[in-house]
Regions:
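Active-site PLP-lysine loop of aminotransferase-like
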Residues: 3, 49-50, 89, 167
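A short core secondary-structure module
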Residues: 2-41
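Flexible, small-/acidic-enriched active-site or ligand-binding loops
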Residues: 35-66
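Gly/Ser/Thr-rich beta-alpha loop segments that engage phosphate groups in nucleotides
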Residues: 3, 51-54, 74, 79, ...
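A short, charged helix-loop
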Residues: 56-83
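Alpha-helical interface subdomain recognition
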Residues: 59, 83-187
């Protein structure tokens, strides 16, 4: 089989794979060594962002893995994959929040340094409103992210819903804050 858009396959020593067993309905989780015969990893794929994480494709041809490499029990593969996606949503929310924080820090520093009409840009009321809105939204996103992480840590039933909300809010916020920061810094 094959799979596209695999993160870190070119740098990983082991691959976590979720697969079906003998055309059955149950999924299993496996740890596959990258050097196993039949494992083929493509060159890295270019992308528009997230440059620190290599993306590539995987192809498996008659790969044999010992039963000791199985994660959990037969049928646990789907829940393992769901948990990985859940953790990824929380991680993406955190990364987007970090980018937004960085953008507002740069914009605020610039607004304090840049003089317009004989005084710092940061003294302009419209700029203050813009920065205040950016920080307020960042803190709201941070609170949602912390709540989500706490729910994950405690295994609460609504964690997936909160993880999706946190990712949505943080990524939308990141786009807005970065766009506003560009406006404040002259673009």
């Amino acid at each position: 089989g094959s799979k596209k858009f695999i993160t870190r396959a070119t740098t990983a020593d082991w691959l976590m794979v979720v697969a079906r067993l003998d055309q059955g309905e149950k999924f299993i989780g496996l740890l596959v060594p990258r050097e196993a015969p039949g494992v083929h990893i493509s060159a890295e794929v270019g992308k528009l962002g997230w440059f620190g994480v290599p993306i590539s494709s995987l192809t498996f041809s008659d790969v044999r893995i010992p039963v000791t490499h199985r994660l959990g029990e037969e049928g646990d593969g789907f829940s393992l994959a769901q948990d990985a996606l859940l953790r990824a949503r929380i991680g993406h929310a955190a990364m987007a929040l970090g980018r937004a924080i960085g953008a507002v820090e740069i914009a605020a520093a610039y607004a304090c340094e840049r003089n317009t009409f004989g005084k710092p840009l940061s003294t302009q009321q419209g700029v203050q409103w813009m920065l205040a809105d950016m920080v307020t939204q960042i803190e709201a996103s941070r609170a949602l992210l912390y709540t989500t992480a706490q729910k994950y840590d405690h295994g609460e039933a609504d964690t997936a819903t909160f993880a999706s909300m946190a990712k949505l809010h943080a990524t939308d916020l990141c786009m807005k804050v970065v766009t506003d920061a560009l406006q404040l810094t002259g673009g």
